[in-house]
UniProtKB/Swiss-Prot annotation:
It is found in: Cytoplasm. Its EC number is 6.1.1.15. One of its GO terms (molecular function) is ATP binding. One of its GO terms (cellular component) is cytosol. This is Proline--tRNA ligase. The keyword ATP-binding applies. Keywords: Aminoacyl-tRNA synthetase, ATP-binding, Cytoplasm, Ligase, Nucleotide-binding, Protein biosynthesis. One of its GO terms (biological process) is prolyl-tRNA aminoacylation. The gene is proS. Its main location: cytoplasm.
């Protein structure tokens, strides 16, 4: 992508409305723009990151055996009246009527709808277990939306829903998502700590929030510091192994970890003083087991091996991609801008032409740009006629992991400079070596 033809409206000054680092940097880097209170457009640079976050989420959901579908944003109020949540949910839910005056709602979550899909399609235990997920925009009318897309009214959510014949089966499905979430956050460059949490309006009797430690977090959290160094389940994790997944769950729930809502001061004080960690955190994911809370009132049941009908046991599992993007920035930035993990960076490398219009610099940059693009790399080519300082500031601000810098003096020697955005380390190498670093 040539920067001269790309839409990336950089802001030179810090926006006054931005309260936290991620909000400020996302606005300055031209990733998002506010349309109304708590509602944002994702501009091209931001959407590239969001798409890569979603790709990782999809890969890990699929690896754990979940199946993607797509459900509508608008839902019938009748389904929510069936479950008993229509009146209980409160003013966060946006209620509307269609032209026939039928009550509808802009879905804040999808337990009712997915249960309706299940009950009309699945009749036998032989079709279980089943886990369905989708990635969709949702709306919750927050009293005080703030921090950009960290706490917005319209947001994107990956929500998955599991269906099992028994509680034991449902707990295995819960453990699958538990392990999948640990892997997802790790691949995003984040360390998320699962903490026992309140079930809230979703309901149920088992729930964990996945918390990313950050000074700007909304919640106060308390945990054992060893969580910071726990090993993440590997790529070879067997998601069909009941014992293996239970061992992962047991390990990650063996030490004290709780949000402020579930905090037990006495239990926390029992942790040796030097091993206690109290901090602030960002909720990045939330999983629930709620048994037959929805299947019973909505009649979602299957015929079991005994020939009798059984209400299915359910769980739901949410991750907010539009919240994860700022969470990654909160965890990885410096005074100059964002430092993206390679897995979600909008581009793999930025090629910086220090003297656009100089034949040698132009030819060198075109050569590198073409070679890396042909190799399947996402490349941003700064071919603008901006000053060198502006080019460097832009590259640092948007956080692309590697910068390849081509100036007249280096190019005359057949060389370019390669800079690592995270460490700041610079290395001069031949043009061929710079290309081979990415295509070898």
């Amino acid at each position: 992508m040539r920067l001269s033809r790309y839409f990336m409206p950089i802001l030179k000054e810090n926006p006054k409305e931005a309260e936290i680092v991620s909000h400020r940097l996302m606005l300055r880097a031209g990733m998002i723009r506010q349309q109304s209170q708590g509602i944002y457009s994702w501009l091209p640079l931001g959407k590239r990151v969001l798409d890569k976050v979603n790709a990782i989420i999809r890969e890990e959901q699929n690896r754990a055996g979940a199946i993607e579908l797509s459900m509508p944003t608008l839902q019938s109020a009748e389904l929510w009246q069936e479950s008993g949540r229509y009146d209980a949910y409160g003013k966060e839910m946006l209620r509307i009527k269609d032209r026939q005056e039928r009550p509808m709602l802009y879905g804040p979550t999808n337990e009712e709808m997915v249960t309706d899909i299940f009950r009309s399609s699945v009749k036998s235990y032989k079709d279980l277990p089943l886990n369905l997920y989708h990635i969709q925009l949702k709306f919750r009318d927050e009293i005080r939306p703030r921090f950009g897309t960290m706490r917005s009214r319209e947001f994107m959510m990956k929500d998955a829903y599991s269906f099992d014949l028994t509680r034991e089966g449902a707990e295995h499905s819960y453990n699958k998502m538990f392990a999948a979430y640990l892997r997802t956050f790790d691949r995003l460059g984040l360390r998320a700590i699962p903490m026992r949490a309140d079930t809230g309006p979703i309901g149920g009797n088992l729930s964990h929030e996945f918390i990313i430690l950050a000074d700007t977090g909304e919640s106060e959290v308390f945990c054992h510091k060893d969580f910071v160094d726990f090993d993440i389940p590997g790529e070879s994790t067997d998601f069909d192994s009941v014992e293996g997944l239970q061992a992962i769950f047991d390990k990650w729930t063996s030490l004290y970890a709780a949000t402020s809502e579930m905090h037990d001061e006495a239990a926390f004080n029992a942790v040796p003083e030097g091993e206690r960690l109290s901090a602030r955190g960002i909720e990045a994911g939330h999983i629930f087991y709620f048994g037959t809370k929805y299947s019973e009132p909505m009649g979602a049941k299957v015929q079991g091996p005994d020939g009798k009908e059984h209400f299915v046991h359910m769980g739901s599992y949410g991750i907010g991609p539009t919240r994860l993007v700022p969470a990654i920035i909160e965890a990885s930035h410096d005074d100059n801008g964002i430092i993206w993990p390679a897995s979600v960076a909008p581009f793999d490398v930025v090629v910086i032409n220090m003297k656009a219009g100089d034949q040698a610099c132009d030819d060198t940059c075109e050569l590198i740009y073409a070679a890396l693009t042909k190799a399947g790399k996402d490349v941003l080519y700064d071919d603008t006629d901006d000053r060198a300082g502006t080019k460097f500031a832009t590259a640092d601000l948007i956080g692309v992991p590697v910068q390849i810098i081509a100036g007249p003096r280096a190019v005359a020697n057949g060389e370019v400079e390669v800079k690592d955005r995270k460490t700041g380390a610079r290395e001069t190498m031949t043009i061929e070596a710079a290309i081979n670093r990415f295509v070898a």
